[in-house]
Amino acid sequence: MKLTFLGTGAAIPTKYRAHPSISLKFDGEIFLFDCGENTQRQIIFTDVSPMKINNIFISHLHGDHILGIPGLMQSIAFQGRTKPLNIYGPKETAKMIENILNVGYHSIDYPINVYEISAKSPEKIISSDNYEVFSFPVVHSVPALAYVFKQVKKPRMDLEKVNKLGIEIGPDLKRLKDGFNIELNGKIITPDDVTVPPKKGICVGYSGDTIPLNEFAEFLKELKCTTLIHEATFDKSMDKNAKETLHSTVSDALNIAKLSGVNTVILTHISARYDEISAYEKDIVEFKAEHPDLHILIAEDLMEYSLKGK
């Protein structure tokens, strides 16, 4: 699994930071979290394939998180896309996409599926054989969502147990792999009899724009998340601004990371007021003095971060 930070800025882009967008590459697919203006151009400088983007997850409908969608949709249409594009977001996402398609002379020949998500309670919005995606309602000035991407690992077959029970390669073994019981020599054998617990999978949380929420930290902990991407629009000295605009500071994000039990936190959504990040680094040094085990990164445009399960 690999994260690519296409844009790490906030409401106003800078020379160094584009509007928010994060690519998550897993098992040959690209999952895009937010799609700010200029996202498709940022992609050019990476190994992210636009044609492999099957799912876009929108945290909320502020312009800095969605204005890259029209251009991206048009470009992949020009490249001959035929498979569906799934777009997830809060209430009014469908209206937003409809408005995009009704403005200008778009030629979109592939299906676009829009899924509006309740901002009232956590939901499992995708469930597949090897991953799950969850939404979590957060608090911002408009309906907003956080997301969690969780790798699903299945129990592994223990060949020593298989051989000891005299199970041969064939239909019986396949049924056990598929999760069904079998009968052998008058004895019922269950999948648990021939497997070992799965290794811990990768789990990544993305806060979107939000105030710090202990409930979100608890949700991440429940899902055993290993990495958190959290907005940090302001440094600690601007706590008042963060509260007024319903954003988070560096310290807020780090405290949520600590409460959630993740190993790594990556700070993003950096305000345009910061030409350099010394104020962020100061807050991080203070936090690390008491919590040295937490791995802390400040995201930069085009930064890549690889994740491996245990």
UniProtKB/Swiss-Prot annotation:
The keyword Nuclease applies. Zn(2+) 2 binds at residues 64-65, 209, 269. It catalyses: Endonucleolytic cleavage of RNA, removing extra 3' nucleotides from tRNA precursor, generating 3' termini of tRNAs. A 3'-hydroxy group is left at the tRNA terminus and a 5'-phosphoryl group is left at the trailer molecule. Binds 2 Zn(2+) ions. InterPro entries: RibonucZ/Hydroxyglut_hydro (IPR036866), RNase_Z/BN (IPR013471), tRNase_Z_dom (IPR027794). Its EC number is 3.1.26.11. It is an enzyme of class 3 (hydrolase). Its cofactor is Zn(2+). Zn(2+) 1 binds at residues 60, 62, 140, 209. Keywords: Endonuclease, Hydrolase, Metal-binding, Nuclease, tRNA processing, Zinc. The active site is at 64 (proton acceptor). SUPFAM superfamilies: Metallo-hydrolase/oxidoreductase. One of its GO terms (molecular function) is zinc ion binding. Belongs to the RNase Z family. Zinc phosphodiesterase, which displays some tRNA 3'-processing endonuclease activity. Probably involved in tRNA maturation, by removing a 3'-trailer from precursor tRNA. Homodimer. This is Ribonuclease Z. The gene is rnz.
